C-alpha cells in the first residue's frame, strides 16, 4: 500500500511539473514540430553524461511533451529469454524548464506489457540485467505480465561565483512482473539512483566536471504452484548451463545490492565547435539470498564498469556535423557460497562455511556514429546518419571449465526528411528510413561439466548462443505527421507510425517484426 501511494505521489508531482512547463513554454516559443524536438534533444551533450550540473552548457530551450504509445513485437529471432510475442502500451511525459535561478528537467513513464510464448525464465523481472544466479523452468511457453514505473529528474544551478555550477539527477524505478504458468513467479524490482555533480569553468571555452553515482536496488522473486497435484522441475542457475535441479513449489529469492561510482568530464567549445568527453567507473555488489524467513546466502556478484564517451559537434549556418563514440568494459565475478544449517535453539539459521569465485563474465560494448544535419530555421530539413554498435561477450565457468563467447556488430544507415505540408498550422511530415545489418564475427558455447542431459545445457544455452552468432539484416520505416492543434496556440499534436523487421537466414530463426503507433502533443 505504501509503495502504491508513493508511486501516485511521484506521478502527481511530475504531471504538475509538466503543467508548469506548458504555461511557461507557450509564452516563450512558437511550438516545436517533431523534427524540431528531435534537433533539440540531439544537441544535448551534457545530458548524455552522468553530470546534471552541466545542464546550463546545453542551453536547452523550454519544452514539454505528453505521448501515448502502443508497440507490438513478434517473431522467433530473439534471445532465449525474450518472449516470441510482446504487446506494450505506455504513457510518457517529459519537460525541460529554465527558471533563471534553477534549471529543471524531468520524465515519467508507465508501461504495461503482456508477453506470450516466453521460455525458461522463472525468476527475474529482467533476466538480462547482469544477474546470472536465478531460476528457470523446463522451457514450456508461458505468459508474463509486466508493469513498469520510471521517474527521473535533473535540477541544476546556473553559473554561480563566475565559475561553478551544481546539479543532481535522481531516478526511481519500480518493475512488477508475474508469470502466468506453473511454476509461477511474482517478481518485484526497485531501484533508486542519485547522481550529484558539479562543474568548474577554467576559461571562457573550457569546462571540467565531476560527479558521483550511487544506486540502491532490490528484487524479490517468489515462486509458487497453482496446481499442487503436478510437481514441475525447475533449475537453479549458477552459470553457463551449470544448474541444480529441483522439483516442487520452487523458492523465494531476495536480491539486494549497491553501486558506487564516479565520473569526470571535460568540455571545450567555441562558436563553431564543441567537444565533450567523459570518463566513468563504478562497482556493483549484489547479494542473492534464498528464503525471506530464514535467509541463506546463495551467491553474490561483484561487477565493475569502466568506460568513456566522446561527443563532437561542428556547427555552420546550414549544417551540423556530429561524431559520437563510446566504450564500456564490464567485468563480473560470480561468487557462490557453501552453508550449513544450524538448528540450535540459540542461533537457528545458516552458517557460512566457504565462498569463492566460480564464474566470470566480461562484456565489451563500443559505439561509433556520424550524423549530418541540414538546418531549416528552428528544425532540420533532412538528417543522415551512419554508425556501428559492437558487443563482445566472454563468459567462463571456472571448474570444470565451460565457455560462452561471441563477437557481434550492428551496422546501420539512417535518413530522415522533414517535409513541409503546410505553413499556416506548422504542418510537417517526417519520414525516417533505416537500414540495419547484424554481423557475427565469432562465437562458441562449450560445456564441460558432468550434467550434459540438463535442458539448460542441451537447449537453453545453445539456443542463446545461436542468436548471438547469427547474421541478420533488416529495415525500419516510420512516418510522423505533426501540426498545431490551434493556430493561436503553441501546442503541436503528432501521430507516428513505425514498422521494422529484422530477418535472419540462420536455420534456427526466421525474423522479428515490430509495429508501433504513437499519439502525442508537445509545447
Over which residues does each language-model region extend?
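Residues that define the transmembrane beta-barrel architecture of outer-membrane proteins
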Residues: 85-91, 145-151, 188-192, 256-262, ...
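Transmembrane beta-strands of outer-membrane beta-barrel pores
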Residues: 68-74, 110-114, 159, 172-176, ...
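Short, flexible helix-coil linker/hinge segments at the edges of structured domains or between repeats
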Residues: 120-136, 180, 214-256, 285-300, ...
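Outer-envelope beta-barrel architecture signal
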Residues: 60-64, 100-106, 162-166, 204-208, ...
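Outer-membrane beta-barrel "beta-signal"
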Residues: 29-31, 204, 511-523
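Residues on the lipid-exposed face of transmembrane beta-strands in outer-membrane beta-barrel proteins
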Residues: 91-97, 151-157, 194-200, 262-268, ...
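Long, internal scaffold/assembly segments composed of regular secondary structure
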Residues: 242-386
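Outer-membrane beta-barrel translocator domains and adjoining extracellular loop/strand segments
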Residues: 76-82, 117-123, 178-185, 221-227, ...
